[in-house]
């Protein structure tokens, strides 16, 4: 055993690796009782690195209440815009109902966001991972071209101890958000009215409504639970919540940087492999989008997702992913991988031709 004191952290060179069970025990004890983060680095001779945990609040977290209040307003404005248009089409628009259904839209949308983040928070609390949040992030409302929010975030301040925990941390958020969105979607399907074909055609010609150009498999399955004869299903704003959440979930599951999909995929891949995948994803999506657009005119959704993934790669993917605290750990979460693939399939955007 050899000690190397670097001032900021201490390295201990070992003759052999600490087994995963013992590492987990020591990791939690050092963090809880001594506020020290323990890492096991993979090298010719395994290294235990001890780093003091410094209590520091994220700058965004300091403004959480202001951000949350602003998000409520911007999401409500989005709901107001969607609801007023929706109710006008079915000749049921009045101020009281518009406000009531805008509140319903706001509540359901924010519920899916909070369910997602609470899924992450559940794993963090269970595994004693230091985290703070969730914090809601406002964005321009639909009147200004967006959906009122950039989502929600929790700030993880200590690394997951094992690869299994890393995968669980990554999958639990999308899974909880998906489940809540699907329940909301089921409600939305059965409160969405149908309109006659001639009325739908007239409304589309005037630009009052638009045909959905792309969907996801899960949204398709939801909508087809309603049998519509000689008419069109008019998407209720509550059903629109599920539609948006599925698209956002797919993007979040891409294996890029520290997106949730990045956590899951990094748990069973090496650093170089993961970095190559993160770079390949935007290229593949953009290539697929351009090919489909040139030959079939249906590639715009993949171009859009490809642009989004490029931005996410530049923001979070260029520096890779640190992985778990124990680099020598070989644990895997099989059910996380199965759920990851299932969620990708169910939420992937599919052009409607």
Question: Where are the model-predicted features located?
Answer:
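Hydrophobic transmembrane alpha-helices and their immediate loop junctions
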Residues: 1-353
